[in-house]
């Protein structure tokens, strides 16, 4: 997709026009569009993609293929659910500060929202296994989650060329909405091999408005073109992980795990087709309070269509010394080039991504030194964006750091407060540059009393 929406002086104006709380046109009751952000590129596709990684993985470069943990969820690779050792309720929040600029100007903006809600649990309670002295050679996990997947928010104004008869014109473009995903995830593990699936229900609504007005004629009627469309439908995700555990000779001559292992992982989505329903409306109104005129020119509702979501895959390799050290790298690709949407046709590009991450725990079993039990994380992410400006694809490069702070709940089950900070650059150099700092805060509240089989003697 190629577009020339961002000439330098206009780009500066559009950045200042919306901020985080853009207001509606005060003289028109037709629309109530209040974007939560002002991102020009969110006009295309289904909006700005929102990271689906939880706070723990966000601090490690957004690793997803190989990350598995006994007390954290990794729903991007559902196979990791089979490694859970406790029921985990997770909630995540994020805030982002962006400095946007072109060759001649800059602006600052804040945004933030809920990142995810999720509940996951093992299918075999580890306490029962221990009390019954059963081998944990197989297990499973299940989870339910809700998260936004895209966000649309823009409020900008483009000045048209001066017309000899009508004078200069203005086009005010505004949009809001986004897409969400509710997922049911499940996984099974036998020895070192885990496999899982995500069943995703995608839904959402997006509203786009364009108001054309004549700047030099205050009495001239303005024309608004309003488009709304919703999406709904299912697609599938998948994941596999294999952990090769290193062993050593035990006291009785048998082989026992050393706690060190290599993890190979693959995950992704199968794409899929979802339903769309669009409504189109064009109308005229008076932009001033002197003359009140409202006239609907055309309206059409219930326009059924389809949208093809892209498929993706990620391959990863990691080394772990359990409860001590983790390092991983991965490569992924998403086929946005096959994306289609009858309600809002756009041309997107395939994207690739690379991520590197590390986690270090000084002493997970330390009794009286809190900071030795903290999980310290760092990472790097390099990835494309499916949208392009003037034929050049946008890109994001970022470094991440994070910590996982262990906390004890009344049941003495360990839980975590996870914080990740990402510093990066996004956009196309000298056309649309964004330097940002993003904070992700996550709570992982764990309890192993679910499915606990109590016995009476």
Each predicted region: which residue ranges?
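Subset of outer-membrane beta-barrel
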Residues: 23-457
């Amino acid at each position: 997709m190629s577009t020339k929406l961002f000439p330098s002086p206009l780009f500066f104006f559009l950045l200042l026009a919306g901020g985080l709380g853009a207001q509606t046109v005060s003289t028109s009751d037709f629309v109530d569009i209040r974007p939560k952000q002002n991102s020009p590129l969110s006009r295309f596709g289904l909006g700005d993609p929102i990271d689906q990684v939880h706070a723990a993985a966000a601090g490690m470069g957004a690793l997803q293929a190989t990350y598995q943990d006994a007390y954290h969820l990794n729903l991007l690779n559902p196979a990791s659910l089979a490694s859970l050792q406790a029921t985990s309720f997770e909630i995540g929040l994020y805030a982002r500060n962006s400095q946007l600029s072109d060759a001649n100007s800059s602006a600052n903006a804040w945004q933030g929202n809920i990142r995810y809600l999720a509940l996951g649990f093992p299918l075999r309670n580890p306490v029962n296994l221990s009390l019954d002295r059963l081998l944990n050679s197989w297990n499973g996990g299940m989870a339910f989650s809700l998260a936004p997947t895209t966000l649309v928010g823009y409020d900008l104004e483009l000045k048209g060329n001066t017309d000899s008869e009508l004078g200069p014109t203005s086009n005010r473009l505004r949009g809001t909405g986004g897409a969400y995903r509710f997922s049911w995830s499940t996984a099974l593990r036998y020895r070192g091999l885990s496999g899982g699936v995500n069943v995703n229900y995608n839904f959402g609504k997006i509203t786009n408005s364009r108001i054309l007005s004549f700047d030099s004629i205050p009495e001239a009627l303005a024309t608004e073109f309003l488009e709304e469309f919703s999406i709904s439908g299912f697609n599938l995700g998948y994941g596999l992980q294999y952990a090769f555990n290193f062993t050593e000779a035990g006291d009785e001559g048998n082989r026992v795990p050393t706690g060190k292992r290599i993890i190979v992982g693959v995950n992704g989505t199968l794409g899929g087709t979802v339903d769309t329903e669009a409504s189109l409306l064009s109308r005229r109104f008076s932009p001033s309070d002197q003359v009140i005129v409202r006239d609907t020119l055309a309206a059409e509702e219930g326009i059924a269509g389809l949208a093809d979501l892209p498929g993706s895959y990620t391959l990863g390799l990691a080394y772990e010394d359990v409860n001590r050290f983790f390092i991983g790298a991965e490569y992924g690709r998403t086929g946005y080039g096959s994306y289609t949407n009858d309600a809002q046709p756009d041309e997107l590009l395939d994207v690739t991504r690379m991520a590197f991450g590390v986690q270090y725990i000084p002493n997970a079993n330390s009794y009286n030194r809190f900071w030795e039990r903290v999980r310290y994380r760092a990472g790097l992410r390099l990835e494309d964006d499916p949208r392009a400006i003037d034929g050049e694809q946008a890109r994001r490069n970022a470094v991440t750091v994070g910590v996982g702070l262990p906390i004890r709940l009344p049941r003495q089950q360990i839980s975590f407060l996870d914080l990740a900070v990402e510093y990066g650059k996004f956009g196309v150099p000298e056309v649309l540059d964004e330097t940002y700092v993003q904070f992700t805060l996550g709570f992982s509240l764990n309890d192993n009393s679910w499915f606990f089989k109590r016995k009476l003697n």
